Protein backbone atom coordinates (compact mmCIF):
# COMPACT_ATOMS: atom_id res chain seq x y z
CA UNK A 1 0.00 0.00 0.00
CA UNK A 2 1.50 3.33 -1.07
CA UNK A 3 1.52 6.56 0.93
CA UNK A 4 -1.38 8.13 -1.01
CA UNK A 5 -3.62 5.12 -0.25
CA UNK A 6 -2.69 5.28 3.44
CA UNK A 7 -3.49 9.00 3.51
CA UNK A 8 -6.85 8.35 1.81
CA UNK A 9 -7.73 5.66 4.37
CA UNK A 10 -6.80 7.95 7.24
CA UNK A 11 -9.02 10.72 5.83
CA UNK A 12 -11.83 8.22 5.29
CA UNK A 13 -11.47 7.05 8.88
CA UNK A 14 -11.69 10.60 10.18
CA UNK A 15 -14.87 11.20 8.14
CA UNK A 16 -16.41 8.02 9.57
CA UNK A 17 -15.46 9.11 13.09
CA UNK A 18 -17.06 12.50 12.50
CA UNK A 19 -20.24 10.88 11.21
CA UNK A 20 -20.49 8.49 14.16
CA UNK A 21 -23.74 9.38 15.96
CA UNK A 22 -23.49 11.00 19.39
CA UNK A 23 -26.01 9.93 22.02
CA UNK A 24 -27.63 12.15 24.65
CA UNK A 25 -27.04 10.62 28.08
CA UNK A 26 -30.32 12.12 29.38
CA UNK A 27 -32.89 10.92 26.85
CA UNK A 28 -31.01 8.60 24.47
CA UNK A 29 -31.57 10.73 21.37
CA UNK A 30 -28.87 10.43 18.67
CA UNK A 31 -27.20 13.25 16.72
CA UNK A 32 -24.87 13.09 13.73
CA UNK A 33 -23.05 16.27 14.77
CA UNK A 34 -21.46 16.96 18.12
CA UNK A 35 -22.58 20.61 17.96
CA UNK A 36 -26.22 19.49 17.58
CA UNK A 37 -25.88 17.30 20.67
CA UNK A 38 -24.39 20.23 22.63
CA UNK A 39 -27.34 22.44 21.66
CA UNK A 40 -29.80 19.67 22.53
CA UNK A 41 -28.30 19.08 25.98
CA UNK A 42 -29.10 22.69 26.88
CA UNK A 43 -32.77 21.64 26.91
CA UNK A 44 -32.07 19.27 29.82
CA UNK A 45 -29.80 21.70 31.66
CA UNK A 46 -32.06 24.69 31.04
CA UNK A 47 -29.00 26.51 29.73
CA UNK A 48 -29.62 29.61 27.56
CA UNK A 49 -26.24 31.25 26.95
CA UNK A 50 -27.29 33.75 24.27
CA UNK A 51 -28.71 36.91 25.87
CA UNK A 52 -30.50 39.80 24.15
CA UNK A 53 -28.80 43.09 25.04
CA UNK A 54 -32.08 44.97 24.47
CA UNK A 55 -34.53 43.12 26.75
CA UNK A 56 -32.56 40.35 28.50
CA UNK A 57 -34.38 37.44 26.84
CA UNK A 58 -32.23 34.30 26.74
CA UNK A 59 -31.89 31.63 24.05
CA UNK A 60 -30.28 28.23 23.57
CA UNK A 61 -29.09 28.98 20.02
CA UNK A 62 -27.33 31.94 18.42
CA UNK A 63 -29.73 31.65 15.47
CA UNK A 64 -32.72 32.07 17.81
CA UNK A 65 -31.18 35.22 19.29
CA UNK A 66 -30.53 36.59 15.78
CA UNK A 67 -34.20 36.05 14.89
CA UNK A 68 -35.35 37.59 18.17
CA UNK A 69 -33.26 40.75 17.66
CA UNK A 70 -35.37 41.53 14.58
CA UNK A 71 -38.28 42.27 16.93
CA UNK A 72 -36.26 45.20 18.26
CA UNK A 73 -34.68 46.31 14.96
CA UNK A 74 -37.83 45.80 12.89
CA UNK A 75 -35.77 43.99 10.23
CA UNK A 76 -37.85 41.75 7.94
CA UNK A 77 -35.50 40.24 5.34
CA UNK A 78 -37.89 37.59 3.96
CA UNK A 79 -40.37 39.00 1.43
CA UNK A 80 -43.45 37.36 -0.11
CA UNK A 81 -43.44 37.52 -3.92
CA UNK A 82 -47.24 37.34 -4.00
CA UNK A 83 -48.22 40.27 -1.78
CA UNK A 84 -44.93 42.02 -0.90
CA UNK A 85 -45.46 41.34 2.82
CA UNK A 86 -42.16 40.87 4.68
CA UNK A 87 -41.23 38.64 7.63
CA UNK A 88 -38.53 38.30 10.24
CA UNK A 89 -37.83 34.59 9.60
CA UNK A 90 -37.87 32.25 6.60
CA UNK A 91 -40.08 29.80 8.52
CA UNK A 92 -42.79 32.45 8.98
CA UNK A 93 -42.60 33.30 5.26
CA UNK A 94 -43.10 29.62 4.34
CA UNK A 95 -46.13 29.47 6.64
CA UNK A 96 -47.48 32.73 5.16
CA UNK A 97 -47.19 31.41 1.59
CA UNK A 98 -49.79 28.78 2.47
CA UNK A 99 -52.36 31.61 2.72
CA UNK A 100 -51.88 32.12 -1.02
CA UNK A 101 -51.70 28.42 -1.93
CA UNK A 102 -54.45 27.34 0.49
CA UNK A 103 -52.27 24.43 1.61
CA UNK A 104 -53.13 22.98 5.04
CA UNK A 105 -51.00 19.87 5.44
CA UNK A 106 -51.56 19.33 9.18
CA UNK A 107 -54.88 17.62 9.98
CA UNK A 108 -56.48 16.83 13.35
CA UNK A 109 -57.37 13.14 13.73
CA UNK A 110 -60.20 13.98 16.14
CA UNK A 111 -62.28 16.50 14.18
CA UNK A 112 -60.62 16.72 10.77
CA UNK A 113 -59.73 20.41 11.07
CA UNK A 114 -56.64 21.23 9.02
CA UNK A 115 -53.86 23.74 9.64
CA UNK A 116 -51.07 25.33 7.64
CA UNK A 117 -48.66 25.07 10.59
CA UNK A 118 -47.66 22.07 12.70
CA UNK A 119 -47.57 24.10 15.98
CA UNK A 120 -51.15 25.24 15.29
CA UNK A 121 -52.27 21.61 15.08
CA UNK A 122 -50.48 20.72 18.33
CA UNK A 123 -52.12 23.67 20.11
CA UNK A 124 -55.51 22.76 18.65
CA UNK A 125 -55.27 19.14 19.80
CA UNK A 126 -55.09 20.32 23.41
CA UNK A 127 -58.72 21.45 23.01
CA UNK A 128 -59.62 17.77 22.70
CA UNK A 129 -57.22 16.48 25.37
CA UNK A 130 -57.63 19.39 27.82
CA UNK A 131 -53.87 19.26 28.35
CA UNK A 132 -52.30 22.33 29.97
CA UNK A 133 -48.64 21.41 30.44
CA UNK A 134 -47.30 24.89 31.23
CA UNK A 135 -47.82 25.90 34.87
CA UNK A 136 -47.06 29.22 36.59
CA UNK A 137 -44.84 28.73 39.64
CA UNK A 138 -46.21 31.94 41.20
CA UNK A 139 -49.96 31.24 41.22
CA UNK A 140 -50.37 27.71 39.86
CA UNK A 141 -52.38 28.75 36.80
CA UNK A 142 -51.84 26.34 33.89
CA UNK A 143 -51.72 26.99 30.15
CA UNK A 144 -51.91 24.94 26.98
CA UNK A 145 -49.15 26.99 25.31
CA UNK A 146 -45.71 28.00 26.58
CA UNK A 147 -46.07 31.49 25.07
CA UNK A 148 -49.26 32.01 27.12
CA UNK A 149 -47.35 31.11 30.29
CA UNK A 150 -44.52 33.51 29.37
CA UNK A 151 -47.02 36.35 28.81
CA UNK A 152 -48.84 35.51 32.05
CA UNK A 153 -45.62 35.53 34.08
CA UNK A 154 -45.06 39.14 33.02
CA UNK A 155 -48.24 40.04 34.93
CA UNK A 156 -46.36 39.00 38.09
CA UNK A 157 -43.01 40.56 37.18
CA UNK A 158 -44.35 43.70 35.49
CA UNK A 159 -41.81 43.08 32.73
CA UNK A 160 -42.47 44.98 29.47
CA UNK A 161 -39.57 44.05 27.18
CA UNK A 162 -41.06 45.26 23.89
CA UNK A 163 -40.48 48.99 23.40
CA UNK A 164 -41.71 51.27 20.61
CA UNK A 165 -38.83 53.04 18.83
CA UNK A 166 -41.13 55.94 17.91
CA UNK A 167 -42.60 56.98 21.28
CA UNK A 168 -40.92 54.77 23.89
CA UNK A 169 -44.11 53.06 25.05
CA UNK A 170 -43.41 49.53 26.35
CA UNK A 171 -45.46 46.33 26.13
CA UNK A 172 -45.37 42.85 27.67
CA UNK A 173 -46.18 41.16 24.34
CA UNK A 174 -44.56 41.56 20.92
CA UNK A 175 -48.02 41.33 19.30
CA UNK A 176 -49.17 44.36 21.32
CA UNK A 177 -46.10 46.29 20.17
CA UNK A 178 -46.79 45.38 16.53
CA UNK A 179 -50.41 46.55 16.85
CA UNK A 180 -49.28 49.78 18.54
CA UNK A 181 -46.72 50.53 15.82
CA UNK A 182 -49.57 50.68 13.29
CA UNK A 183 -50.69 53.90 15.01
CA UNK A 184 -47.42 55.47 13.82
CA UNK A 185 -47.26 53.76 10.41
CA UNK A 186 -50.98 54.09 9.62
CA UNK A 187 -51.00 50.45 8.47
CA UNK A 188 -54.45 48.80 8.46
CA UNK A 189 -53.95 45.25 7.17
CA UNK A 190 -57.41 43.87 8.05
CA UNK A 191 -60.02 44.81 5.45
CA UNK A 192 -63.76 44.12 5.46
CA UNK A 193 -64.80 42.21 2.33
CA UNK A 194 -68.29 43.74 2.52
CA UNK A 195 -67.56 47.47 2.60
CA UNK A 196 -63.77 47.79 2.28
CA UNK A 197 -63.24 49.44 5.67
CA UNK A 198 -59.77 48.67 7.06
CA UNK A 199 -58.57 48.09 10.63
CA UNK A 200 -55.29 47.87 12.52
CA UNK A 201 -56.41 44.79 14.50
CA UNK A 202 -58.14 41.59 13.43
CA UNK A 203 -60.38 41.74 16.54
CA UNK A 204 -61.67 45.15 15.38
CA UNK A 205 -62.48 43.68 11.96
CA UNK A 206 -64.35 40.75 13.56
CA UNK A 207 -66.43 43.18 15.64
CA UNK A 208 -67.10 45.36 12.60
CA UNK A 209 -68.24 42.40 10.47
CA UNK A 210 -71.06 41.82 12.96
CA UNK A 211 -72.61 45.10 11.78
CA UNK A 212 -73.12 43.38 8.42
CA UNK A 213 -74.20 39.96 9.74
CA UNK A 214 -76.28 41.29 12.66
CA UNK A 215 -74.62 38.69 14.91
CA UNK A 216 -74.82 39.47 18.65
CA UNK A 217 -72.75 37.04 20.71
CA UNK A 218 -72.86 38.72 24.12
CA UNK A 219 -76.05 38.12 26.11
CA UNK A 220 -77.15 39.76 29.37
CA UNK A 221 -77.94 37.14 32.03
CA UNK A 222 -80.40 39.54 33.69
CA UNK A 223 -82.68 40.57 30.82
CA UNK A 224 -81.56 38.45 27.81
CA UNK A 225 -80.60 41.53 25.76
CA UNK A 226 -77.78 40.80 23.30
CA UNK A 227 -74.82 42.86 22.10
CA UNK A 228 -72.19 42.73 19.38
CA UNK A 229 -69.34 43.76 21.70
CA UNK A 230 -68.25 42.63 25.17
CA UNK A 231 -67.65 46.29 26.07
CA UNK A 232 -71.28 47.15 25.25
CA UNK A 233 -72.52 44.28 27.43
CA UNK A 234 -70.31 45.45 30.32
CA UNK A 235 -71.76 48.97 30.03
CA UNK A 236 -75.30 47.56 29.88
CA UNK A 237 -74.80 45.52 33.09
CA UNK A 238 -74.45 48.78 35.01
CA UNK A 239 -78.18 49.38 34.49
CA UNK A 240 -78.82 46.27 36.62
CA UNK A 241 -76.00 46.75 39.14
CA UNK A 242 -76.41 50.52 39.52
CA UNK A 243 -72.65 50.93 39.15
CA UNK A 244 -71.51 54.43 38.12
CA UNK A 245 -67.72 54.34 37.86
CA UNK A 246 -67.21 57.71 36.14
CA UNK A 247 -67.17 60.55 38.69
CA UNK A 248 -66.98 64.28 38.05
CA UNK A 249 -64.11 65.82 40.01
CA UNK A 250 -65.92 69.16 39.97
CA UNK A 251 -69.16 68.23 41.73
CA UNK A 252 -68.90 64.53 42.61
CA UNK A 253 -71.77 63.40 40.36
CA UNK A 254 -71.30 59.87 38.95
CA UNK A 255 -72.20 58.31 35.61
CA UNK A 256 -72.47 54.85 34.07
CA UNK A 257 -70.71 55.84 30.84
CA UNK A 258 -67.59 57.90 30.15
CA UNK A 259 -69.47 59.70 27.34
CA UNK A 260 -72.11 60.88 29.84
CA UNK A 261 -69.37 62.24 32.11
CA UNK A 262 -67.81 64.14 29.19
CA UNK A 263 -71.18 65.72 28.32
CA UNK A 264 -71.67 66.68 31.97
CA UNK A 265 -68.18 68.23 32.22
CA UNK A 266 -69.03 70.52 29.29
CA UNK A 267 -71.78 72.02 31.46
CA UNK A 268 -69.12 73.04 33.99
CA UNK A 269 -66.90 74.37 31.22
CA UNK A 270 -69.77 76.56 29.95
CA UNK A 271 -70.48 78.04 33.39
Swiss-Prot record:
Induction: Up-regulated by Golgi stress-inducing agent nigericin. SMART domains: ZnF_C2H2. A zinc finger (C2H2-type) spans 22-44, 50-72, 78-100, 106-128, 134-156, 162-184, 190-212, 218-240, 246-268. Belongs to the krueppel C2H2-type zinc-finger protein family. It comes from Homo sapiens. It is found in: Nucleus; Nucleus, Nucleolus. May be involved in transcriptional regulation. Essential for Golgi structural integrity. One of its GO terms (cellular component) is nucleolus. InterPro entries: Znf_C2H2_sf, Znf_C2H2_type. Transmembrane segments: none annotated. Signal peptide: none annotated. The gene is ZNF501. PROSITE patterns: ZINC_FINGER_C2H2_1, ZINC_FINGER_C2H2_2. The lineage of its organism: Eukaryota, Metazoa, Chordata, Craniata, Vertebrata. The keyword Zinc-finger applies. GO terms for molecular function: DNA-binding transcription factor activity; RNA polymerase II cis-regulatory region sequence-specific DNA binding; sequence-specific double-stranded DNA binding; zinc ion binding. Gene3D superfamilies: Classic Zinc Finger. Its main location: nucleus. This is Zinc finger protein 501. Keywords: DNA-binding, Metal-binding, Nucleus, Repeat, Transcription, Transcription regulation, Zinc, Zinc-finger. GO terms for biological process: Golgi organization; regulation of transcription by RNA polymerase II. Pfam families: zf-C2H2 (PF00096).
Amino acid sequence: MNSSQISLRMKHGRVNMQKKPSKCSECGKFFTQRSSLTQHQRIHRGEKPYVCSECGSCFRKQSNLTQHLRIHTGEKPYKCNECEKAFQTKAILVQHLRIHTGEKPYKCNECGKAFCQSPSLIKHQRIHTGEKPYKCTECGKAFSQSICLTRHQRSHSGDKPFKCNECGKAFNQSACLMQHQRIHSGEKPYTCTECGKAFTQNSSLVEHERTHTGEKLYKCSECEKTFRKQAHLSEHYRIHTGEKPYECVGCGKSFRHSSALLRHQRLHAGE
